[in-house]
Amino acid sequence: FDIENMVFSKKGHQFTENPVFISGLARSGTTMLMRYLHETGEFRSLTYQDMPFVLMPNLWKKLSFRKPAGELKERAHQDGILVSLESPEAFEEVFWRIFTGEQYIYKDRLKLLKTNIEVLDKFRDFVKNALLSSDQPDKLRYLSKNNNNILRLGYLKKSFPEAKIVIPFRDPLQHALSLLNQHIHFSGIQHENKFSLDYM
């Protein structure tokens, strides 16, 4: 992250100050909402192509050979959502884990995050780096989908007072059934694959 900030200058760019942050409970429709917005072409989100160095999107873009999007494949959730290398995803959580992980991740729960000016400035740089790595850094808006954003709404609003925060709600019975199905599905996977348990 520090190397990215030293190497890639943001001077001369007029970045948009009105990103969109999507948050909500798991299985509430946040992924589909993000994808619909991303498909308008007006937003920059981190995608699978930014992996594994999501804190250095510009440096990784220079060093890696950008592959074509490739064929669409169903994601691990087996919920009918198809993904490719160009699909947006909630990779922003890496930033929060690295810079504030010990403040909100507990063994038995997650905790609301108190704002910290130094981290707030780093987050603004993180968003600008993501925009800078796009083909139209001065035109696109940053788009984030992260269910854990609910823990840091104060950060988001202090970082970007003009931001829009969207929290979708789903029919409670459908929502509960979807959560149960995913719990059963991933419990089976994690029983067979320890890496999956650590990753999730």
What do the predicted segments below correspond to?
Residues G29-T31, P52-L55, L151-L153, L173-S178:
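Short catalytic/ligand-binding loop motif for oxyanion handling, primarily in non-cytosolic enzymes
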Residues I22:
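Hydrophobic anchor at the beta1->P-loop junction of P-loop NTPases
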Residues F1-P19:
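Extreme N-terminal, non-catalytic leader segments
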Residues N181-M200:
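PAPS-dependent sulfotransferase catalytic core
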Residues T31-R44:
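A conserved segment at the C-terminal end of the G1
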Residues K145-N147, L156-N181:
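Conserved phosphate-donor/acceptor-positioning beta-strand/loop module used by diverse small-molecule
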Residues Q49-Y142:
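PAPS-dependent sulfation machinery
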Residues L25:
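P-loop (Walker A) phosphate-binding loop of NTP-binding proteins
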